[in-house]
Regions:
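S-adenosylmethionine
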Residues: 1-241
């Protein structure tokens, strides 16, 4: 067991055969996430009593992490597109014993009128090209095409359109991807600011000081594997006006 970068509670575990052989995992004492994914809950900075909607939540790591940061107060509505994905979230809820996360099936591209301005925080960790995790999934680069890139950007914007409607006035929207593609990251940020009543807000008060940089002062963080020793990952923090 080694200390992982940036977060004191993040550990790197090695020299084991399978995650299911670890008692700490089976007992729900640990949850598997890259440090980059852990930074989503850090950037969201939920307060006790917050209502959070996690729109693309499976397998539930970010939802459970956000719930843990609130203790037993507040709640997380963890959604994904299929029953299979909702069941993955439920499996992790059961294993970790969290009591304030509820999993359900909800297509993130389909408007849910019951969620209109309902959330203090919305997490939109959207489907992406995955260019930030090619080191773990090298097959991604053989499947990439310009057409697929355009299609994924359209999907992301459909989800962001719904996410924008679910945040309360003065609430927080976290937009994240596991890619390094500008089309899916910075260009989506510019598109979103142009079309919705939001402003970027710096995540610096909530993330480790080592990660503070010019872009985080503006409101977003791009992690690069060769520099940050994490997955390639993008996080933007928006405040609804």
């Amino acid at each position: 067991v080694e200390q992982a970068p940036y977060l004191p509670y993040a550990l790197k575990i090695s020299d084991y055969n399978h995650i299911l052989t670890l008692e700490t995992f089976l007992q729900g004492k640990i949850l598997v996430q890259d440090v980059s994914s852990m930074l989503v809950a850090e950037a969201a900075s939920p307060k006790k009593g917050d209502h959070i909607i996690d729109m693309c939540a499976a397998p539930g790591g970010k939802s459970i992490h956000a719930a843990d940061k609130m203790g037993d107060y507040g709640n997380v509505d963890a959604r994904d597109v299929s029953q299979y994905k909702a069941d993955l979230i439920k499996e992790n809820i059961h294993r970790t014993g969290v009591i304030n996360v509820e999993a359900r099936v909800q297509d993130a591209t389909v408007y849910d009128p019951d969620s209109e301005q309902a959330a203090d925080i919305v997490i939109a960790d959207v489907p992406c090209s995955g260019y930030g995790v090619i080191g773990k999934k090298p097959e991604i680069k053989y499947r990439a095409t310009p057409q697929k890139q355009e299609e994924i950007v359209m999907l992301q914007r459909m989800i962001l359109d719904k996410a924008a409607k679910y945040v309360k006035p003065d609430g927080t929207l976290i937009f994240s991807t596991c890619t390094i593609a500008r089309e899916e990251n910075e260009e989506n940020v510019l598109w979103f600011l142009k079309n919705y009543p939001y402003r970027l807000e710096s995540p610096d008060p909530y993330i480790p000081e080592e990660l503070h940089c010019k872009s985080t002062k503006l409101g977003y963080l791009q992690l690069l594997p060769g520099i940050h020793k994490t997955d390639g990952f993008f996080i933007a923090r928006f405040r609804r006006k």
